[in-house]
């Protein structure tokens, strides 16, 4: 019995311990487990719901994708049809363009071929015409007839309004023109009382003064400087030259420095011009004007035909004495050289300062002509003119330009026939060679 009671008490103690300390954690654990199961069930339900929603959305997405696919397919079909239509239209346009371009290219090739044929035929025709013309003008009478025909055409020409200046005035401005005119007027007034020796001395002194002004640039600058009062310049001139030059020369130099010059070099040009006038006046007194003119023009043609000699005479870096010596040597071998013409040439070559010798000599010859109130006509012909033709030409040109004309003839066989005339800056080209050249130039490219 005691064992039973002991066991009962032990059982009661065990039950108490279980109830006191074991049951509460177990109950809490079970309750937590129930909550976990309940939460898992809720999550499962939520997941099932989401799955159902996902299936619905998937189905909707499939439906939308199908609809979009059908839409894209329809649009692609429409685009393909439109592109096909555009390509077809472009192909048609391109075909038309290529066709038109081909036709244009054919036309261009045809025109080019025609042009080439015309050029070839034209050139051949011009060459053949040149041969015929050369054969025709080989006869002197036929060649002379071409000059007569040109003169007949020239007679129909209206009077020219061109103003012809000499080289001395063409390069001057208004102030220098007036000053040069005053100096020339002064020369004409004092030169009438001088004999040949006096004019020679005047020319030499003026040329020496020109050389002095060339070498003494400060003096030239002072004397050529425009001033309202020229008295100081005149006094300086007299102080320097009164005992070195004649009264006539000093009087002319007073006039020169008293006037206004556009540039400093114009004063030297004016002094040189007056020195030339003195020698031309000497030729006039001696009755040698025609001879001097002819020899000046002839020497100008010599320089034109001998460019080496012209270049040596034009080389102003060489001392003037050397160039004048070369000129004297060139003139020595020529018979009948007029002394006045030689003096004019020596004076001109010695005072060159950048100009070409051949042009300076022609300017000098034209000055000699202009002193007689005439103008120079440089005439080129294939052969010498007869006296009748020269007279007729002189009369026609005198009528056209309203002044007596001095004809200077240059023979150039390359002209074939007709004449080429230059008066001042005006050119009248009636040569056969120029007409053949114009025909050649007029051929299509």
Curated annotation (Swiss-Prot):
Gene Ontology molecular function, alphabetical: proton-transporting ATP synthase activity, rotational mechanism
UniProt xrefs under CDD domains: ATP-synt_Fo_b
Region (ATP synthase subunit b) location: 1-168
Domain of life (superkingdom): Bacteria
Keyword terms of this UniProt record: ATP synthesis, Cell membrane, CF(0), Hydrogen ion transport, Ion transport, Membrane, Multifunctional enzyme, Transmembrane, Transmembrane helix, Transport
Membrane-topology descriptor: Single-pass membrane protein
InterPro entries: ATP_synth_B-like_membr_sf (IPR028987), ATP_synth_b/b'su_bac/chlpt (IPR002146), ATPase_OSCP/dsu (IPR000711)
Transmembrane residue ranges: 3-23
Cellular compartments annotated: Cell membrane
Region (ATP synthase subunit delta) location: 169-445
GO cellular component terms listed in the entry, alphabetical order: plasma membrane; proton-transporting ATP synthase complex
Segments forming a coiled coil: none
Keyword Transmembrane helix: yes
Primary location recorded for the protein, binned into one broad class: membrane
Subunit record text: F-type ATPases have 2 components, F(1) - the catalytic core - and F(0) - the membrane proton channel. F(1) has five subunits: alpha(3), beta(3), gamma(1), delta(1), epsilon(1). F(0) has three main subunits: a(1), b(2) and c(10-14). The alpha and beta chains form an alternating ring which encloses part of the gamma chain. F(1) is attached to F(0) by a central stalk formed by the gamma and epsilon chains, while a peripheral stalk is formed by the delta and b chains.
Additional record remark: Binds 2-aminothiazole antibiotics, which are antitubercular agents.
Function text: F(1)F(0) ATP synthase produces ATP from ADP in the presence of a proton or sodium gradient. F-type ATPases consist of two structural domains, F(1) containing the extramembraneous catalytic core and F(0) containing the membrane proton channel, linked together by a central stalk and a peripheral stalk. During catalysis, ATP synthesis in the catalytic domain of F(1) is coupled via a rotary mechanism of the central stalk subunits to proton translocation. This fusion protein includes a component of the F(0) channel (subunit b) and of the F(1) subunit (subunit delta). Two copies of subunit b and one of delta together form the peripheral 'stator' stalk which links F(1) to F(0).
NCBIfam families: PRK13428.1, PRK13430.1
Protein name in UniProt: ATP synthase subunit b-delta
Species, as recorded: Mycolicibacterium smegmatis (strain ATCC 700084 / mc(2)155) (Mycobacterium smegmatis)
Highest classification ranks of the organism: Bacteria, Bacillati, Actinomycetota, Actinomycetes, Mycobacteriales
């Amino acid at each position: 019995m005691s064992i039973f009671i002991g066991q009962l008490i032990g059982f009661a103690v065990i039950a108490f311990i279980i109830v006191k300390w074991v049951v509460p954690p177990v109950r809490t654990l079970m309750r937590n487990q129930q909550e976990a199961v309940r939460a898992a069930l809720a999550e499962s339900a939520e997941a099932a719901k989401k799955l159902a929603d996902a299936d619905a959305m998937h189905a909707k997405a499939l439906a939308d994708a199908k609809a979009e696919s059908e839409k894209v397919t329809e649009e692609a079909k429409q685009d393909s049809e439109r592109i096909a239509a555009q390509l077809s239209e472009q192909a048609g346009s391109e075909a038309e363009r290529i066709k038109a371009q081909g036709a244009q290219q054919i036309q261009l090739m045809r025109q080019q071929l025609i042009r080439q044929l015309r050029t070839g035929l034209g050139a051949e025709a011009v060459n053949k015409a040149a041969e015929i013309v050369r054969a025709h003008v080989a006869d002197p009478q036929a060649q002379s007839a071409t000059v007569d025909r040109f003169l007949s055409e020239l007679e129909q020409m209206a009077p020219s309004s061109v103003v012809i200046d000499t080289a001395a005035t063409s390069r001057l401005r208004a102030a220098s023109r007036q000053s040069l005119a005053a100096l020339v007027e002064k020369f004409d007034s004092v030169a009438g009382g001088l004999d040949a020796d006096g004019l020679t001395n005047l020319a030499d002194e003026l040329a020496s003064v020109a050389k002095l002004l060339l070498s003494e640039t400060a003096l030239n600058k002072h004397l050529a400087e425009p001033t309202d009062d020229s008295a100081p310049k005149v006094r300086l001139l007299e102080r320097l030259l009164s005992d070195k030059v004649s009264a006539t020369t000093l009087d002319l130099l007073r006039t020169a420095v008293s006037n206004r010059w556009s540039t400093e070099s114009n004063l030297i040009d004016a002094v040189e011009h007056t020195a030339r006038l003195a020698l031309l006046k000497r030729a006039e007194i001696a009755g040698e004007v025609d001879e001097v003119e002819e020899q000046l023009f002839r020497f100008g043609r010599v320089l034109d035909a001998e460019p080496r000699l012209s270049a040596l005479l034009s080389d102003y870096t060489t001392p003037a004495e050397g160039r004048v010596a070369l000129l004297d040597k060139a003139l020595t071998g020529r018979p009948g050289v007029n002394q006045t013409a030689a003096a004019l040439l020596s004076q001109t070559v010695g005072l060159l300062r950048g100009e070409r010798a051949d042009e300076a000599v022609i300017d000098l010859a034209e000055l000699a002509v202009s002193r007689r109130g005439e103008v120079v006509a440089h005439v080129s012909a294939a052969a010498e003119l007869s006296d009748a033709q020269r007279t007729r030409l002189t009369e026609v040109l005198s009528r056209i330009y309203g002044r007596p004309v001095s004809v200077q003839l240059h023979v150039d066989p390359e002209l074939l026939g007709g004449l080429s005339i230059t008066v001042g800056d005006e050119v009248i080209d009636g040569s056969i060679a120029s007409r053949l050249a114009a025909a050649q130039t007029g051929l299509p490219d």
